[in-house]
């Protein structure tokens, strides 16, 4: 079976070729996903106005918070499936597939109902002012009505990668981006639906991709496919999915908490346009962050399979290659941020004040990018091999343990500059912590590897 053969290659094919095979489609897909938000911001900034960008920026932590639940399930399930495939436990992998579908349906519908009931208070808490609330409200109503579609779409893409179909996952993501661009232009520029048009374009493009994903998993000739009896939730499988997925879930939740706090501090010390500037900087930064997420997603099935198969030499090899790739990506982002910030900001708006604020925001937010790729890969590595506590600690160290106190303290000294400078300082400190933890664990891994070689000899 072709799909089964592709899965077995995770333990035999050269690691470098495997990483390119899995990471390149994921990088393209994740970068395309980051363009999703950029496209919305560009069309809204050019077609609606500067204040609409600030309103849209308020919604992103909200959207990420709801997506955190789907990401937790998706990453947890894909990692669990990869490990089970490495152990050749195909029946359990099949049941994990079905349980993932059920979990995403339940969570997607439940979150939509709760958030719609308390939408305006939530947006106020996230930093919306009287000027930006109307834009944020109009956008989020439509996004929440289609939330179950988003959960299913992102969850199915994670499952495609675990099922040794990284190219199909890439195609699905690229399709949604292309359709989003087309529909944004149609709904915003032609139909004049404003920020609501951007939200409708997002949900419709994801729905079309989801229909194709469902068709792929309906093929009974595939190793992993839909069939009767796999959708009933099983406590052991759900616990395993959630235990692995708790790290990315907490990472996303912490990121949302931080962005909420950043938005509120920016409004307090710099006004609504500062939130818009942060939205612009964050959009540019996320292009490169998503590249690294792509590397991480490419590493995940390789690391998970070889950890399950106890092939430690291949595990260490894929980790080292992933760190090199991530660092190269983030250095490229740093160079663009330092030398071409005007052109990045100008893409989103013609408002001179917002452009000036955006230039500063881009340079500060991306200042420590050369070390962030390393930190991201290390955190993901521990997640891939099931070391949940270490992964959670590294996730929390940057966001809650370092950045949050800095955001509270530094503005008292440097006003609005204190908000901006908190970000690169926490980035650098988190990278140092990740390096120390990794040195400790690598020594442990190398000892295990040497013992393994002695047993073989």
Label the model's feature ranges.
Residues 1-23, 81-148, 190-245, 303-368, ...:
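Short alpha-helical transmembrane segments in multi-pass integral membrane proteins
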Residues 10-47, 61-76, 80, 105-112, ...:
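N-terminal transmembrane alpha-helices
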Residues 21-40, 142, 176, 205-209, ...:
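Transmembrane helical elements of multi-pass membrane transporters/channels
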Residues 24, 40, 77-78, 118-119, ...:
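Hydrophobic/aromatic residues in alpha-helical transmembrane segments
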Residues 35-54, 123-130, 186-193, 256-283, ...:
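Helix-terminus/linker motif at the lipid-water interface of multi-pass membrane proteins
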Residues 53-113, 150-169, 277-341, 372-391:
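Small-residue-rich hydrophobic transmembrane alpha-helices
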Residues 65-68, 180-185, 210-214, 286-290, ...:
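Hydrophobic transmembrane alpha-helices of multi-pass small-molecule transporters
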Residues 74, 143-161, 172-177, 198-211, ...:
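Short runs within selected transmembrane alpha-helices of multi-pass transporters and secretion channels
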């Amino acid at each position: 079976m072709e799909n089964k053969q592709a899965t077995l290659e995770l333990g035999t094919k050269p690691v470098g070729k495997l990483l390119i095979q899995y990471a390149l489609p994921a990088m393209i897909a994740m970068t395309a996903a980051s363009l999703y938000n950029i496209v919305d911001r560009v069309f809204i900034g050019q077609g609606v106005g500067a204040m609409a960008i600030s309103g849209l920026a308020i919604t992103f932590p909200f959207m990420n918070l709801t997506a955190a639940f789907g990401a937790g399930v998706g990453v947890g399930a894909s990692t669990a499936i990869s490990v089970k495939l490495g152990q050749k436990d195909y029946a359990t992998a099949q049941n994990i597939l079905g349980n993932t579908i059920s979990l995403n349906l339940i969570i997607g519908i439940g979150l939509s109902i709760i958030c719609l009931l308390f939408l305006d208070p939530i947006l106020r808490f996230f930093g919306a002012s009287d000027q930006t609330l109307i834009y944020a409200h109009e956008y989020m109503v439509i996004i929440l009505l289609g939330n179950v579609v988003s959960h299913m779409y992102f969850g199915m893409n994670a499952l495609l990668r675990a099922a040794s179909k990284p190219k199909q996952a890439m195609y699905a993501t690229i399709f949604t981006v292309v359709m989003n661009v087309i529909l944004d232009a149609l709904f915003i520029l032609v139909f004049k639906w404003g920020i609501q048009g951007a939200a409708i374009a997002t949900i419709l493009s994801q729905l079309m991709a989801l229909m194709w994903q469902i068709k792929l998993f309906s093929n009974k000739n595939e190793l992993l496919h839909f069939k009767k009896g796999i959708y009933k939730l099983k406590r052991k499988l759900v616990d395993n999915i959630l235990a692995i997925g708790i790290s990315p879930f907490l990472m996303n939740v912490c990121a949302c908490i931080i962005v909420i706090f950043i938005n509120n501090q920016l409004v307090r010390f710099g006004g609504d346009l500062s939130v818009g500037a942060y939205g612009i900087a964050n959009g540019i930064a996320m292009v490169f962050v998503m590249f690294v997420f792509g590397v991480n997603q490419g590493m995940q099935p390789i690391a998970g399979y070889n950890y399950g198969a106890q092939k430690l030499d291949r595990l260490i090899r894929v980790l080292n290659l992933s760190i090199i790739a991530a660092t190269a990506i983030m250095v490229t982002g740093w160079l663009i941020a330092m030398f071409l910030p005007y052109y990045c900001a100008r893409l989103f708006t013609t408002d001179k004040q917002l452009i000036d604020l955006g230039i500063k925001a881009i340079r500060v937010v991306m200042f420590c990018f050369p070390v962030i790729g390393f930190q991201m890969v290390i955190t993901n590595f521990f997640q891939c091999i099931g070391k949940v506590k270490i992964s959670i600690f590294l996730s929390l160290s940057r966001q809650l343990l370092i950045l949050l106190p800095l955001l509270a303290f530094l503005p008292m000294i440097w006003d609005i500059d204190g908000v901006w400078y908190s970000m690169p300082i926490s980035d650098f400190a988190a990278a140092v912590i990740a390096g120390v933890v990794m040195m400790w664990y690598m020594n442990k891994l190398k000892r295990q590897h040497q013992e393994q070689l002695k047993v073989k000899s």
